[in-house]
């Protein structure tokens, strides 16, 4: 199956499908005429006498140097080779596929001036599985993601490396094995390919999709913890949240009510419970998780716009002029990444406090210490809670805003940068930490509920526990725990826990 993209209006759901399923994509042929028109205009400018940045001049601080018409192709090739300065581990295939799809969307708007054969090559590489090797580090998020996108483009011209059928090869060999030929870049094409925010945006989108799934699952594990601790569902009453008015809070409260509906555990202590109020990590879940949901939704709107944007320079305007601007500056992406980081950090922080509550017999309302069936002989989930604290602390350190840490580059021509790529890339580690924290809460919450037997939890949460127990058996005695934590985290990552509950309960990214 190949997804057909309409540049300028590709929805978030399609972008998530590209990220998660790795489907090949192509541009709607209706946009080809606009692409060819802009390419023809670039060819006219290149043949003329007027200097235009990036077409017949040098780049960055070297923009004042005029390039002879006979050197234009060499200029583009040199640009790509000189900018391949990435370091670190290769980005994963699903991230690179998303980067390439975003580049197609941008080029397909018909304002960049590349020839149709450039777009076709990217489409064919995605279809046949030639995936450029892009190192993870090297971009400051302005002027675009130059180094990582140069590595992408290098593969297109037969330079650098690419992955093909799981093998890392010289790009020329990978293209040959796939039956493809490298492209010879014409005027401006190299610049159009590397001068954009697609790497930062792809990483931020990946962070967003991972964070949203974790946020949904955290509502489930939070409900489990509430029932395990014999907490009250009264703070989730609809009117409390409508009186405040925040959409995320309202949606989170609604989800928690639905998840806990029908719990016999809850019914057992509706009367005679001497506890007046639960701790904040139980009582304030709608307020905290809802606020996180709100900023994830705000980031989603920003990133959907950016994914459909034209972010190279110069641009071919509707009147045919080539005009220099600054759409390559990824400040919106940097801000969105920082917002996502805050949400990821806070979801993990409140989840960790619920884990700590459940393993503490002074707070858990009758549960054994560390949820061990034979405390003392067994340590139960003692160190699982410690691990969750370690991961929470690491995320707090990583949540520092990246966007405020600009530094001048390129001989002060590029004197303010966004740091969007770094800000977005750290989301991969932060969400991995969060998935592990939520997985640990799933283990503690489910075990806590099981220790309340013969009282039973709600039908929705019972389905979640059944999915969990299909991969992680209940803890009777101490055992090697690392596999349990790994398997529980995988149930968060692959959406199995979120998918266990009835459709419509968990809030989407739609505001």
Curated annotation (Swiss-Prot):
Cytoplasm as UniProt keyword:
yes
Q: What class of enzyme is it?
A: lyase
Give the protein name, as stated in the record.
Histidine ammonia-lyase
Point out residues bearing the modification 2,3-didehydroalanine (Ser).
143
Report the GO terms under cellular component. Answer: cytoplasm
Task: Supply the InterPro entries for this chain.
Answer: Aromatic_Lyase, Fumarase/histidase_N, HutH, L-Aspartase-like, Phe/His_NH3-lyase_AS
From the record heading this protein, give the residue positions of the covalent cross-link 5-imidazolinone (Ala-Gly): 142-144
Q: What is the lineage of its organism?
A: Bacteria, Pseudomonadati, Pseudomonadota, Alphaproteobacteria, Hyphomicrobiales
> What keywords were assigned to this record?
Cytoplasm, Histidine metabolism, Lyase
* Pfam families cross-referenced by the UniProt entry: Lyase_aromatic (PF00221)
Q: Name one GO molecular function term.
A: histidine ammonia-lyase activity
Native source organism of the sequence: Brucella anthropi (strain ATCC 49188 / DSM 6882 / CCUG 24695 / JCM 21032 / LMG 3331 / NBRC 15819 / NCTC 12168 / Alc 37) (Ochrobactrum anthropi)
Which reaction is recorded as catalysed by this protein? L-histidine = trans-urocanate + NH4(+)
Taxonomy, superkingdom: Bacteria
Summarize the PTM comment: Contains an active site 4-methylidene-imidazol-5-one (MIO), which is formed autocatalytically by cyclization and dehydration of residues Ala-Ser-Gly.
